[in-house]
Amino acid sequence: MARSHKLEDVRNIGIAAHIDAGKTTTTERILFYTGREHKIGEVHDGAATMDWMEQEQERGITITSAATTCEWAGKQINIIDTPGHVDFTIEVERSMRVLDGAVSVFCAVGGVQPQSETVWRQRNRYGVPSIVFVNKMDRTGANFYAVEEQIRTRLKGNPVPIQIPIGEEDNFLGVIDLVKMKAIVWDVDAAMGSNYHVEEIPANLLQKAQEYREKMIESISEVDGNEHLAEKYLEGEELSEDEIIAGIKAATIGMHIVPMTAGTSFKNKGVQTLLDAVVAYLPAPTECAPIKGTMMDDEDEEVIVPSTDSGEFASLAFKIMTDPFVGTLTFIRVYRGSLEAGSFVHNSTKDKKERIGRIVKMHAVKREDIKEIYAGEIGAVVGLKYTTTGDTLCSEADKVILERMTFPEPVISVAVEPKTKADQEKMGLALAKLAAEDPSFKVHTDEETGQTIISGMGELHLEILVDRMKREFKVEAEVGAPQVSYRETIRDTVNQEYKYAKQSGGRGAFGHVYLTIKPGDAGTGFVFHNEIKGGVIPKEYIPAVEKGCAETMSNGVLAGYPMEDIDITLYDGSYHEVDSNEMAFKLAASMGFKEGCRKARPAILEPLMKVEVEVPEDYMGDVIGDLNRRRGQVTNMGDRSGNKIVDAFVPLAEMFGYSTDLRSATQGRATYSMEFDHYEEVPKNVSEEIIKKRNG
């Protein structure tokens, strides 16, 4: 079966936004206009196609990025819907990894929200070109130009309107296309916004349209590679429509500008013009920088994997989902070559052979079986045994490992227990499946209490996973109080000698090490240096020393929390010809490391959350007072659409139950968002409390 669309006619895009910007509605409309959807699904009544899990429909927020395929103007558009809630940034992160372009949806009233900043940062990290869609232009308080200003000041982006709105709020009629210099006005009819007509620009907006067209042309002519446009522009020559379109595309793909469009998905205006922009300005796989990787057998050998149909198969698994009917679905993005159903591939990340059962293309929840999937396409594979998120699947003939994704460590834990003994085994299986789908969700058993502990990125994240356990796996669970994931570190540098010697008839044990233990840079975790000269400790025992230190890192000296950011150098020691062995050196290192840490002024670290509260001015004092009581540090205060914005760093330990407290303190008029930011040392009095509680 040949390709349905040429590689250069494929667009892989994500639709990203904060909660309530109207992202799911926008995706629904796109599916409707591209002919995939017969009846428009509304989030308001919980029937949107992309929100395919029951809880998403109930909560009206999108949790998992469902992938779907549609067609517009002869181009194939693969859409990945990404969640807007901050507890699910991991989902956004993994979808950004496999996209070539993105549509950032902003609410014309709410503008740039804290979640938008997180998504924008991820977009920049992965170099994903974007188009902005300013949605909800029909709402009271809508202001297209305020959103443009916020993108510039708060996100440090370079927004360039390629359309401007005709009217706003109740009078929003359509947009002016600044490339063609025509007005596009939607009919007020029953055909769900399918009918619009092109007319001349209204006289009262002509001057504004000319001014914004000037700005647009100026922005694109400043970009490297568009010098010919700059020359024509400076000499006062008219640029042709094709030249402007090519200029906008080059500037967008080069991450120099972000074209802005406007509309209201709910009222079916502006979605077709957004699709036109996606097809015209976002890159095909062939127009993106090729993905880098390393060879499986030699991690130092960097290779470049271009997007092409020829060459050996290479793809990245970016999402795992459990489907009630077909079992495990592994979503992959193919970068090179093609893949046939029934064939064998190599998982180079795990060095395992996998058999491809079926290949399906998803349309939100409906699926279509296909025989083959090609470069640049996104699809789901059934029947993989070993593959998890972030693994590379490739051909046996060219074992390449594509760039790995980085996943954040969980910051919050709760104990879960099945309501009945009979559910114990079912719960174990359910949690294992959920953990396979979501790398930011961890499950372990507490050795002391025997309880099952689940950890994730926030209260909502864990709530939803417990809820899914109940719905999808029919396991009822009791959930304990949330626990904070503390860490431990040291503040001083120490040199520590430790000799482990055991003589007991027959063979003894002997290991002797000198370690320098010092605080590492933030975020480095555990770093080990071997500076043994002249074989005072034989080479084969060095890994045992490293292992002894690394394993001890998981159990700190103050309260048994994992340690981080510690730098260890092994610089001297001695051994015994007969009695030395790996175990002895491992124990010497472990005990020496522990003893050294006790002398190095150990400290407890806690996760600090970046919190943003939007609050009416009357309640501002109460909110700030409350944040201070929670050991918060207020970092900034500002205004947004008539409300006050308070930014602060607050310890996670103080944020449990905050939503209820904030609601009652402000009569439900304030909203907040929070995300993990960094670890910081806890004050002495808090540290003493934590140690007392942990050590009973």
Curated annotation (Swiss-Prot):
Keyword Lipid biosynthesis: no
SMART domains to which the protein is assigned, alphabetical: EFG_C, EFG_IV
UniProt keyword Signal, yes or no: no
Localization terms from the record: Cytoplasm
Alphabetical keyword list: Cytoplasm, Elongation factor, GTP-binding, Nucleotide-binding, Protein biosynthesis
Sequence ranges assigned to domain tr-type G in this UniProt record: 8-286
Biological process according to GO: ribosome disassembly
PROSITE patterns: G_TR_1, G_TR_2
Main subcellular localisation: cytoplasm
Residues that bind GTP: 17-24, 81-85, 135-138
A Gene Ontology term for the protein's cellular component: cytoplasm
UniProt GO molecular function: GTP binding; GTPase activity; translation elongation factor activity
HAMAP family: EF_G_EF_2_B
Protein purpose: Catalyzes the GTP-dependent ribosomal translocation step during translation elongation. During this step, the ribosome changes from the pre-translocational (PRE) to the post-translocational (POST) state as the newly formed A-site-bound peptidyl-tRNA and P-site-bound deacylated tRNA move to the P and E sites, respectively. Catalyzes the coordinated movement of the two tRNA molecules, the mRNA and conformational changes in the ribosome.
Protein family per UniProt: Belongs to the TRAFAC class translation factor GTPase superfamily. Classic translation factor GTPase family. EF-G/EF-2 subfamily.
Protein's name in the database: Elongation factor G
Species in which this protein is naturally found: Sulfurimonas denitrificans (strain ATCC 33889 / DSM 1251) (Thiomicrospira denitrificans (strain ATCC 33889 / DSM 1251))
Classification lineage: Bacteria, Pseudomonadati, Campylobacterota, Epsilonproteobacteria, Campylobacterales
